[in-house]
């Protein structure tokens, strides 16, 4: 750990916080006091605080000298003695709308604007906004929380633990909660206001509840409640460690910066990731199930056992990202959710970003406090990390993996660990050297491409770091599990190259074509060459869904790097034209089409050919499934229809255009009542056809009026299709009004509009002109990085690259943004170069298709 990040636990080790908060919603202020019991190692100790007023610091009723240090979000205390002691601190602070610390969430109920109060203390900086503490994950302690607030009739307060002494609350107005288990400060949470919910119990007696504002219908709680109960029961069986606390409450918040937060016993969510109403799509239900399962995995991996410092954040997130799929696959096997695991976790983004020179490794040290935020890189820590955990699980076997986890939880419960502690537990359970296997994957950035070819009857396998764009090859090597389907081949590729003789004999002795990385569980791609590729493509129809998806994903990445021509991908689409798997259609096929679209300019002959390709690819799905849902159809059919119709409407396929227009007219008086699975594409179609200011205003009004987060997202996307400057100016005029667009959702508007050629120039100029406002509104929000990353994922010509560099390069002094800016420049440059080299070939391939 570098010295630039001060570690306060080295001078004071807290054991218990007895915390009282008195919150005044109307004044947006709070006062409080905290008695912190702990061991002082030194006479000079430091505690974290951010934007707090420290009124007094007492030890045994005697005032202590202290010095404020706002620059380091701290204050420093002089103690007369060391050892175990209790410091009493009185303080006050303000409630802001930054969605960090203690903050309000706003919603509309019966036409009136209301608010609830809740907390967000992760990532590293936010518990200190609510009370003085050692705000570091290693500084675990127990918490006794008491709350008082300007309550209104019917208000409810929730926290990590059950309420105690409720009979006294009627006299004092103070809500008091049971002592928490030993845990990190970032996991403390509470929420209060006009809330309601439903509860159930697991077979082991844990009370599970789903809660939201009174604006949300009670029946929208049922789905998540059922999932939560069954997932907890699954994890208890799988880990062989009981859920450790009495309750598991899940609270949907109207305003929330992250997707969800694993506070122990009181998990908080964006409403879209917890609530499922009767008019919901299969895709949204599956998304809710995965998010709930992810947060519940953290109750063991992250809460019960916690990383010692943020550089081991991957221990939390990589594991939870994998276990969400393991658990949901176990409780809902009919969803075939594991077919989507190789891609659904943002793996395509991970494989793309991880191929850019300069990317971070999964495990990286933090050299500056502001860099802690950058550790939450979803493509690397979440998606790549989960892929590595899945690779490890397969390498060990599920039985040894689960056995090792049980030992890990039992040994380290209520304490902190580093990655090596997990490796030791898994090594003991399996008899394998996990550390030597995993270190190259966690400590090195990037990943390898394995080239496979046959030369003179010798199978040659070689590894090299895979890059997209300009790079410096440093000769990195990985311990690669080959996971081949043939006998007679090595298990692992450790060196740069291996040669296996007698290929023709091996082919005779084995069934099927040679495949590496079967089930696509390891974090590398394969470049099959010559006859090996020909064999796979000839046998493509006989491969399983995951293998088909993997082959197309790998060929696309090879095209992104320039190792093969992008134009060659056009012909590969023939292989999946009649496939009915949702994952093949929505992921492999969609990724190739999205890649090809970057080479196409609007209103050109090439666009005509591209749309013809799209219509051909999805016409079979439309003819098979139609426009309207059929009674008793599978979730997969619903999701395939949704994807196919979206593409066909994009490609102006008239039968779908007319059908969508008819649906809109039938629901014109209440567009929210359109079936959720097709509502988004119906709204898009209407905007494409009508393109009027009055429709823009209608959509904006519907956006403000609804409490359905999915509907809001669909309206945002539909609005981005307008090609009307007056309408665009009207939309941009709404973005800074928090009563219209919540700050947490601003990035969705930015992403949707910036990706459309008509709006791009205007929206890009708006973002640059309003950058300081965006920074002020979202500086504490985990979506702030998106305003650097989104244009990097969209821009595709030299003019935009030059503009991106001119605007962002001067901001690289901001450590929280530096890596994303430098990565963004490289990403756009690689795209510009690829399009320049391949544009003519792609246009020709589309014309000849």
Curated annotation (Swiss-Prot):
Subcellular location: Cytoplasm
Enzyme nomenclature, EC number: 3.4.11.2
Record key words, sorted: Aminopeptidase, Cytoplasm, Hydrolase, Metal-binding, Metalloprotease, Protease, Zinc
Sample GO molecular function, one term: alanyl aminopeptidase activity
UniProt site (Transition state stabilizer): 382
Record: residues binding Zn(2+): 294, 298, 317
Domain of life: Bacteria
Residues reported to bind substrate: 122, 259-263
Reaction(s) catalysed by this chain's protein: Release of an N-terminal amino acid, Xaa-|-Yaa- from a peptide, amide or arylamide. Xaa is preferably Ala, but may be most amino acids including Pro (slow action). When a terminal hydrophobic residue is followed by a prolyl residue, the two may be released as an intact Xaa-Pro dipeptide
A GO cellular component annotation in the UniProt record: extracellular space
Cofactor names: Zn(2+)
Enzyme class, broadest EC rank: hydrolase
Cofactor binding notes: Binds 1 zinc ion per subunit.
GO biological process terms, semicolon-separated: peptide catabolic process; proteolysis
Active site: 295
CDD domains from the UniProt entry: M1_APN-Q_like (cd09601)
Subunit structure: Monomer.
Sequence similarity: Belongs to the peptidase M1 family.
Primary role: Aminopeptidase with broad substrate specificity to several peptides. It has more affinity for oligopeptides than for dipeptides. It plays an essential role in the metabolism, it may be involved in nitrogen supply or protein turnover.
Stated name of the protein: Aminopeptidase N
Origin species: Lactococcus lactis subsp. lactis (Streptococcus lactis)
